[in-house]
Swiss-Prot record:
It comes from Bartonella henselae (strain ATCC 49882 / DSM 28221 / CCUG 30454 / Houston 1) (Rochalimaea henselae). CDD domains: ABC_MetN_methionine_transporter. The gene is metN. Its EC number is 7.4.2.11. It is a peripheral membrane protein. This is Methionine import ATP-binding protein MetN. Pfam families: ABC_tran, NIL. GO terms for cellular component: plasma membrane. ATP binds at G42, R43, S44, G45, A46, G47, K48, S49. The keyword Membrane applies. The complex is composed of two ATP-binding proteins (MetN), two transmembrane proteins (MetI) and a solute-binding protein (MetQ). Part of the ABC transporter complex MetNIQ involved in methionine import. Responsible for energy coupling to the transport system.
Length: 344
């Protein structure tokens, strides 16, 4: 059963007046569930940045409604928006730390701005320093920290006021792969420990695959696909999603792709698999049941949300079309997706 919606977007639009109106968000509806990690992905210009600015009230929508914990916040004044904005944490690609302040004071800054006394600020900042793994760095200055450590400070600062939701705007895009992984693991840990809702705005499928529970794909201001991450990875439907997945999933080697024909001696098949079938010798089972021996041309196995998924490219003898048809049907039943790409 899904958790209740923390934020609901109802047919929102945001257009910018130029010589021709450009709608960065176009009649978009979305529910963000309490406690989930939601990945929002799309190419440059898809509307991701505008969406996050609408979520935190920095952009005002032109049409539709935004509900925060059931309250319509779409038309609130800046003063009325303030208490809701305090429930939203933000982390960015650039860390935006105060170079003249030590780590403890950087983290405590949001509390100082809201009038929390020094003793409480100090206590809360120390708790967050421990949470993000920076014990011993309390009195260091930003210039003394690595990029990953600076982002940990940014995360701690975003949590200072105990937000209900954390918005991450390309927060790992400036980091190296190893540091990116450590930051994503930290966010996943914070999500579990605090039951904190996290929205990841990113153009990187690797980020979504690593920790998101659900993914939304944006294109030209509209949601073109959404669902559980493992479902999107194994059975993408929209061309935008398929194109973005090509960057992070195995592809048919060029020596086969450039020689595909309508007919041939060997059928080239793509199959996506998930769950129990990944633990079985299913190609042996295929040979036993259908009588065709498949060869693996390329592929890979990965783990998404604790479930094993895979994408394989197979070659199957095509001389017996009836047997081939049965084999494709058998593979379709066993896998999430199966397609004959052509013949060689």
């Amino acid at each position: 059963m899904e958790n209740p919606s923390l934020i609901s977007l109802k047919k929102i639009s945001r257009c910018f007046n130029t010589t021709t109106d450009i709608c960065a968000l176009d009649n978009l509806s979305l529910n963000i569930h309490a406690g989930e990690i939601l990945g929002i992905i799309g190419r440059s210009g898809a509307g991701k940045s505008t969406l996050i600015r609408c979520l935190n009230g920095l952009e005002r929508i032109d049409a539709g409604s935004i509900f925060f914990e059931g309250v319509n916040v779409s038309n609130l004044s800046e003063t009325e928006w303030a208490p809701y904005r305090q429930r939203i944490g933000m982390i960015f690609q650039h860390f935006n730390l105060l170079s003249s302040q030590n780590i403890l004071n950087n983290i405590a800054l949001p509390l100082k701005l809201t009038g929390i006394n020094k003793k409480q600020r100090h206590k809360r900042a120390l708790e967050l320093i421990e949470l993000v793994g920076l014990c011993g760095k309390e009195y260091c200055y930003p210039a003394e920290l690595s990029g990953g450590q600076k982002q940990r400070v940014g995360i701690a600062r975003s949590l200072a006021a105990n937000p209900k939701i954390l918005l991450s705007d390309e927060a790992t895009s400036a980091l190296d792969p190893e540091t990116t992984q450590s930051i994503l693991e930290l966010l996943a840990d914070i999500n579990k420990r605090l039951n904190l809702t996290i929205v990841l705005i990113t153009h990187e499928m690797e980020v979504v695959r690593a920790i998101a529970h659900r993914v939304v794909v944006l294109n030209q201001g509209r949601i073109v696909e959404e669902g559980r991450v493992k479902d999107i990875f194994t059975s993408p439907q929209d061309d935008t999603t398929i194109a973005m997945l090509k960057l992070v999933t195995p592809q048919l080697p060029e020596k086969f792709a450039k020689n595909l024909k309508p007919r041939g001696q060997e059928a080239i098949i793509e199959i996506n698999i998930a769950g129990e079938i990944t633990q079985q010798p299913f190609l042996n089972l295929l040979e036993d049941e259908i009588g065709l021996r498949a060869r693996i041309l390329h592929g890979g196995i990965d783990t998404v949300q604790g479930e094993t998924i895979g994408r394989l490219f197979l070659g199957l003898p095509a001389q017996n079309q009836e047997a081939l048809k049965k084999a494709v049907q058998w593979l379709t039943e066993k896998g999430r997706y199966c397609e004959v790409l052509g013949y060689v």
